[in-house]
Design a protein with these regions (language model features):
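Short beta-alpha connecting loops at secondary-structure transitions
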Residues: 18-22, 298-304, 332-339, 366-376
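Acidic, His- and aromatic-enriched active-site or binding-groove loops in soluble protein domains
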Residues: 170-182, 264-275, 312, 352
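Phosphate/pyrophosphate-binding betaalpha-module
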Residues: 272-328
Length: 377
């Protein structure tokens, strides 16, 4: 029996099914892209607004330019941090049962997050999200067997924006038992959000052993880390709460116009986030993610349902697997304004490609209108 046939037979015997694997990059190209991303961090560095992060980088040997607020990360420091970042992350539900085993080609879907509007299917219109909508979406997520995690899916407009991050997490913990993908809107939000999670688990030690949430942190393209995103990384690391790094390069707008150039920038921003997280706490759980997009320069819109966007997603995830880091992508969503044939085609193709690529955390189901609207359908 050939090695390939033996591998297929083993997969079928163990799992009952065999899932094809999507690969779009040759190993040589992966190595070249990693090399170019590292070169970006060495020669051009990253802009860092957070003083604690700058201190961590400087103490670890990064070259610091205080006037420009830039840190130039050495090859040795990158190597050191890539060795300590975990290749597997386990996340648990509200009851403390294992829900997500983020490693290898395991695939888990969760709704897209952060929408400002919702599609009102009763009135057939798009309107601002309300608390009532958030609760409906969260309870629906709890009932869907193939959606394995929830997200802080939209931003209710009927509460003050200053407390929206904590309010969303509270509603999620109250209405859904599945693990939560969330994030802070202000630095002050972290402590309250952590306390909510500790209240569910019983202690900080138990929360560290069985994390209930993943915190998104989004660097600003190109190669910039705000005070908020840095602080989120630094706060999550010692608490054992996974951080999901989500760069957002737009081809020709905030990144090089080529797909390869956007991928390299995504890699550089992810690797820089890994470095900051590992300096805050060696072994801190980090997910290598993103929400990149092509860019329509005529309409100034980011087509998330375009095949070019999906190619960037699958490619950077392939590189992350090469580096042995858990993966994330915004896929399985659509640019359509309402649930229709276009939304079905775009979200369906995205979901299939993401699953074939073995992306661990796939955010997107329910998301419409360039990530601005969430729908129950």
């Amino acid at each position: 029996v050939s090695p390939v046939k033996a591998h297929i037979k083993e997969k079928i015997m163990n799992n009952g099914t065999f899932r094809p694997t999507l690969k779009i990059l040759a190993d040589k190209l992966i190595e070249d892209m990693i090399s170019e991303a590292r070169e970006l961090l060495v020669k051009f560095g990253i802009e860092v607004e957070n003083q604690e992060a700058m201190q961590l980088l400087g103490d670890a040997g990064a070259k610091i330019d205080k006037e420009k607020r830039r840190a130039y990360i050495s090859q040795d420091l990158i190597d050191k941090c890539l060795k300590t970042v975990p290749s597997s992350i386990k996340v648990y539900n509200r009851e403390g049962e294992l829900a997500l085993n983020l490693e290898g080609d395991n695939v888990y879907f969760n709704p897209g997050s952060g929408a400002l509007t919702v599609y009102d299917y009763e009135k057939d219109e798009i309107r601002a999200a309300l608390t009532e909508d958030y609760i409906k979406l969260t309870r629906l997520t709890d009932a869907l067997p193939y959606i394995k995690a929830q997200s802080t899916c939209c931003v209710p407009s009927d509460v003050p924006s200053e407390i929206a991050d904590r309010y969303r997490l509270y509603l999620s913990l109250l209405n859904c038992s599945k693990p939560i993908i969330t994030g802070t809107f202000v630095v002050e939000g972290w402590e309250v959000m952590k306390d909510m999670l500790v209240a569910i688990r019983g202690s900080e030690k138990e929360l560290k052993e069985k994390p209930l949430a993943i915190f998104d942190c989004c660097p600003s393209a190109p190669l910039k880390w705000s005070n908020l995103t840095c602080q989120s990384l630094i706060d999550c690391a010692p608490a054992g709460i996974p951080s999901e790094i989500i760069p957002m390069p737009l081809t020709g707008a905030t990144s090089p116009v080529t797909l390869a150039g956007a991928i390299v920038q995504n890699l550089a921003e992810n690797i820089s986030g890994i470095v900051i997280g590992q300096l805050a706490q060696p072994g801190a759980p980090i997910i290598f993610g993103g929400s990149p997009s092509g860019f329509d320069m005529r309409k100034a819109t980011p087509p998330m349902g375009a095949i070019e966007t999906m190619m960037i997603d699958c490619a950077y995830a392939e590189v992350a697997k090469y580096l042995k880091v858990p993966t994330h992508a915004y896929m399985g969503l659509a640019d359509a304004k309402l649930p229709d044939a276009q939304s079905g085609l775009e979200s369906g193709i995205g979901a299939i490609l993401a699953a074939l690529a073995g992306i661990n955390v796939i955010s997107g189901p329910g998301m419409l209108a360039f990530e601005n609207c969430l729908s129950l359908e």
